[in-house]
Amino acid sequence: MTMDDLGARGTTAPTPEEIGAMYDQFGEMLAMTLGSTALHIGMYAPHGQHPPVADLVALADLAQDRQTDFLVDTIDLAPHEHLLDIGCGTGGPAVRLAERTGARVTGINVSKSQLARCQERLTAPNAPQGLAERVNFAYGNAMRLDFADHAFDAAWSIDCIPHLSDRLAGLREALRVLRPGGRFLFTEFALRTSPSAEEVAAFTQMWSCPPLTPFATLVGELQQAGFHVESVRDMTANSALCGELMCVLYEDRRGEIEERFGKEALAHTDPLMAPYRSFCRDHMEYYLLMVRAPEA
């Protein structure tokens, strides 16, 4: 049986023999695209979850919310505490943390468009009452924070540290603005093996970041900055899958991307996707670290 045979059938129901022949010939291809442990539809979201996950974008959104909730649980912020969100993105995690804990959050970002989106979250008609009194956003450079010493009880940085041209400076600034004993929760990539120059270039362009370093280099910089490492979690499986999904969605939404950003964006990005994907899959680690400022 060929694909042409399947297409020619139209709406005619297949015979058991034809179904068997289809799986004999194309079962391995289905396993490559659907999953190989059972060859049935997977439960990508818990039963009854609302809103339901209906496509890959929704699945990616769900994964991001799960990550945010895990970080909120890990930082364990009390209602009276004040957290600095270093590299706050579009504000979703800051708002989610404030809603769940009742704590105050100050977010900083170097992207003006993302800061505009942050403000929209605070003024949206469905924004929780009092949210704008507990959450604020401002333009700010992580390597030169515009805050007084010991201004915050805690800080977190979700996928921002990889962007920094001087990571040690960013770590020292985070320590400076924390009260004695304050905790800093952050994510960071690390280099696992030896990628090709093409793979390194693709990753650094896609992420707008300097080349990654081995994990041991990060540990050394944390010690130089003066932090005490409290816990390290290896989250590499999540980053590898994120890279895979990003590449799939890029191909799936090419038409939308071209319409919104132009053919030039595709021409720039197309040659990066394959080496970016292999870099994420084969050469990168992803860690979640909880560190603390020294006690007074």
Region locations from a protein language model:
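Conserved Class I S-adenosyl-L-methionine
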Residues: 231-296
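N-terminal auxiliary segments of SAM/dcSAM-dependent transferases
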Residues: 1-35
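A short acidic, Gly/Pro-enriched loop at the edge of an enzyme's catalytic core
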Residues: 143-154
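A short glycine-rich, Lys/Arg-flanked "PGG" loop and its adjoining helix->strand segment in the class I
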Residues: 168-183
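Class I SAM-dependent methyltransferase SAM/SAH-binding core
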Residues: 82-84, 93-144
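Short, glycine-/aromatic-enriched active-site segment of Class I SAM-dependent methyltransferases
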Residues: 186-210
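Short alpha-helix
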Residues: 210-226
